Amino acid sequence: MKTQQLLNYAFDQWIAGDTSSLSDLPSAIDGSLVARTGSGGLDFGGMLRHAREKGGPALRKMTFHERARLIKGLGLAIMARKEELYELSYQTGATRKDGWIDIEGGAGTLFSFSSKGRRELPDAHVLLDGQLEPLSKSGSFVGQHIHVPLQGAAVHINAFNFPVWGMLEKLAPTLLAGVPAIIKPAS
């Protein structure tokens, strides 16, 4: 297996970490170097600004159903490359069955959230909460509670034990809710 430097997806592009601060990721099978990773040199404040100013508005322009289809597309992309992921998973010491729970379980989580989003949420930008409520005695003034995406960004830190599924179970509801995410994988 060829050693690769893992890239960081930030600012809508793949960015290599500063090579002077990379960490080695050895194989649990034979100790050989599988990959190198690092986030040195990344502008984390800029990443949050980008999430708030670019990612958030782009997600909020989408309806719940559009975001659900985006999540399904991510699940399909993972399934299309699952054999590559199984090969990498093996290097962590996981059996194929272990990897199945992580990889295909992660994709299944995306499919589940996508399905729930299309079945249980409207093809709209807001979610109505309850009935109209009269706010005046005569009924000339009423109110309606709604749910809308939060402003800002979610920051998720992933664990070692399920590197795919663990990240995706956090990412799916975040995206469905219309909130951009910054994810720190275990390394």
Predicted regions and their residues:
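Conserved small-residue-rich beta-alpha loop and adjacent elements
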Residues: 123-187
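N-terminal Rossmann-like NAD(P)+-binding subdomain of aldehyde/semialdehyde dehydrogenases
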Residues: 1-137
